[in-house]
Amino acid sequence: MKFTLVATVLLTFSLSAFAVEYPVLTTASPDQVGFDSQKLHRLDGWIQNQIDAGYPSINLLVIKDNHIVLQKAWGYAKKYDGSTLLAHPIRATTNTMYDLASNTKMYATNFALQKLVYEGKIDVNDLVSKYIPGFKDMPGDKIKGKDKLRIIDILHHVAGFPADPQYPNKNVAGKLFSQSKSTTLEMIKKTPLEYQPGSKHIYSDVDYMILGFIIESITAMPLDRYVETTIYKPLGLKHTVFNPLMKGFTPPQIAATELHGNTRDGVIHFPNIRTNTLWGQVHDEKAWYSMGGVSGHAGLFSDTHDMAVLMQVMLNGGGYGNVKLFDNKTVAQFTRRSPEDATFGLGWRVNGNASMTPTFGVLASPQTYGHTGWTGTLTSIDPVNHMAIVILGNRPHSPVANPKVNPNVFVSGLLPAATYGWIVDQIYGSLK
């Protein structure tokens, strides 16, 4: 009995010695980790000026050396009901959840793929057709090549798919129209390629819709259930979900987006289009109408604290605390620059040349990577400076500047705050 007890203790000690324990985030003052606090806090007045000028809200969090050194919210989670300014708008707080838009691609789809690659359940050189039966060239297709498309081609955005086929809008989509997830995959299979695969990079939502379906094929689970149960829950994330209103959250916890549904202040129309102020539902049309709110390209909601944990996972090389999702080799594989375009990794956007200055500014290291989201979100992860920045906003929660000229430009989008790189540079410029 005594020998057994000793052996058990030794075995437990031996196993614990090999257990991976990753850094977890703690708070620190900016000065403790190399910032000039006075310079950093100059951002406060500038951002408030942007709010006063009409930018709806900004939530900002900065990580340096495993510490949260700045976390603050400005503006309003909801200030309009339709075109009417609320007498008592709802202020944004650091707990406000935001529609991440295309940051979904990284923190749902890419995280899932990185985990599956690490576990050996998928290889990025696998053919797409291995996981999606019937994914092949169609009779009459002018550009061929679907049969040979690999997952890595999809991740690099070189697969040939159009940027935005607008499946839910029958006037635009035509025969590819779909407002049901059950038919959307079939419409994607029928979507003709617009350019020869591998000939250039065209950022496409379709690519990540496909990747979402691949994840569901491998895991035999809906995408939201897979990431919420195998990634977010183990990490202790409380506010990172798809379809938040179906999962216990209420509108006042979430930042509102477009004032008149998806109509761009009344100039866009299609069957079943939403016309009320969007509040707790994903803004993206394909995600909402064609995918039921859960898609590989859009649909995820989160707050700055949860996003900070996910960015720290990347800085840590794949884990957080006692949770390991993937390894540093996988992180390197997915963030490595594409040989054809230095601004693309596997999904991740990389600070590969001056074209990324509006995103990452001019002071972040060339190894910085991250993503943006159409609703006004940015994530920037800098492994050289061991820094990460998340900006969450609800840019579409303002009138359209000139609906008849360009329905996709909102008044808030004309303000300097809409250019993330300026904010990023002020943060880097505050380093001693």
UniProtKB/Swiss-Prot annotation:
Belongs to the peptidase S12 family. YfeW subfamily. Keywords: Carboxypeptidase, Cell inner membrane, Cell membrane, Hydrolase, Membrane, Protease, Transmembrane, Transmembrane helix. This is Putative D-alanyl-D-alanine carboxypeptidase. It is a single-pass membrane protein. One of its GO terms (cellular component) is plasma membrane. The keyword Lyase does not apply. The keyword Transport does not apply. It is an enzyme of class 3 (hydrolase). GO terms for biological process: proteolysis. It comes from Salmonella typhi. Gene3D superfamilies: DD-peptidase/beta-lactamase superfamily (3.40.710.10). Its main location: membrane. It is found in: Cell inner membrane. Its EC number is 3.4.16.4. It catalyses: Preferential cleavage: (Ac)2-L-Lys-D-Ala-|-D-Ala. Also transpeptidation of peptidyl-alanyl moieties that are N-acyl substituents of D-alanine. GO terms for molecular function: serine-type D-Ala-D-Ala carboxypeptidase activity. Pfam families: Beta-lactamase. The chain crosses the membrane at residues 7-25.
